[in-house]
Amino acid sequence: MASPEASSSGNTEDLRIEDLFHQKRNEDTIAKIFSIIYAPVGLIILLIRVFLGFHTFIVACLLRKSAALRMHTLRIMCSILGIVVEKSGHRDESARVLCANHVSILDHLAVDILTPCLLPSVWDIPSIIRWCFGYVDLGATRGRDQLVSRAKQLLTREQMPLLAFPEGIITSGEKALIKFNTWCFEVSSVVQPVSVRVWRPYPWKVSVSVLGSSWWTDLFYFFALPFTVITVEYLPKMERRENESLEEFTARVAETLAGNLKIAVSKFGISDATEAAKRLRTDRERAKKVVVREKTSPRLADPRQMDECAMRIKQSFPSFHLSAIRRDLEKTRSQTTTVNNLKAGKISSSASDGQTGKVTLDAGTWRGVFDNRKWQMIEVNRQKYMNRDS
């Protein structure tokens, strides 16, 4: 019988790092149409909830974090804001570290409403803002050793548990988990895994987060859509076995959490996810520049301009025939569009387009025959020039 680790690795062999994230907010056509119709209503709901959200924030700051009144009040107010938090499983008070998967920007809020906890801050932000949002400065920006040391000190003087997201980045939670960071398992040998699931009803089934999105964009959809259900499930606590290494304990917790979510544990780490986000952001910026360039650049109209453009493109794509490039330029009247067609394989690399070079009695084809012979001659002489030293 195959081990869970072997089965998990087999399931993730074909996974790309991009597969662990949502690429688009909404990929369903019917849902997109419904979203357009719903937009005016959504904006009104958004404005009302922004006003209510400010009051919720004030309540969260004024009431003591561990008070039962705060938990019940926040849970009711969050439901009005469209953030419905559901709980399953039993919270084991002997576990001082909660280890959860990360699927949205409000995961820590959902867990904190059910179990007041401490969340390490990974940003260098002012103390007042950190206090308002419930973060604690454990020196994460100053290195792992500082983070682990200060986390251990915090647990000795605080009654509330420490909440950690060992993935380090928000994923879709549908394909696989990011490989866990081991720091929180070094803080305590007893941890309680917490699985977090997010659900939205159809046709408002909009992704809670996409790769490279900003926090305020994610929050916009939380407030604009009717409601979002965040389910928090407490799994049985797990203890580090005798003679079990830190990496083995981390992997075992990850496998347990992945098994509860019915997904696998990927081979990718936080650095791979960060690089994927950078690539996506770069591709989006490049695509925007291309669109702007397409709108602002004049269309090729003069045959002489198209001839010069064809020669420039030929230098970058030497395997394509000049006549094929020139013919596509006549259709697109755009250098960028023709280059994209070449990359997409929409243009044949040969010169043939139905013109054999034979002069027919139809005067309408004479121009095409002339152009075909001209570009054929240019191509032949160009090849001779390129091969002159060989």
Curated annotation (Swiss-Prot):
Tell me the membrane topology, using the record's own terms.
Peripheral membrane protein
Question: Where does the CUE domain lie?
Answer: 305-347
Q: Name one GO cellular component term.
A: endoplasmic reticulum membrane
Q: Which UniProt keywords apply?
A: Endoplasmic reticulum, Lipid droplet, Membrane
- The question of whether Nuclease is a record keyword is answered with no
User: Main subcellular localization, coarse class?
Assistant: endoplasmic reticulum
Record topological domains on the Cytoplasmic side: 1-32, 54-390
Q: Which residues lie within the membrane without crossing it?
A: 33-53
**Gene Ontology molecular function terms on file:** acyltransferase activity; ubiquitin binding
The answer to whether the entry has keyword Endoplasmic reticulum is yes
Cellular location of this protein?
Answer: Endoplasmic reticulum membrane; Lipid droplet
What's the family? Belongs to the AUP1 family.
Q: Under which name does UniProt file this protein?
A: Lipid droplet-regulating VLDL assembly factor AUP1 homolog
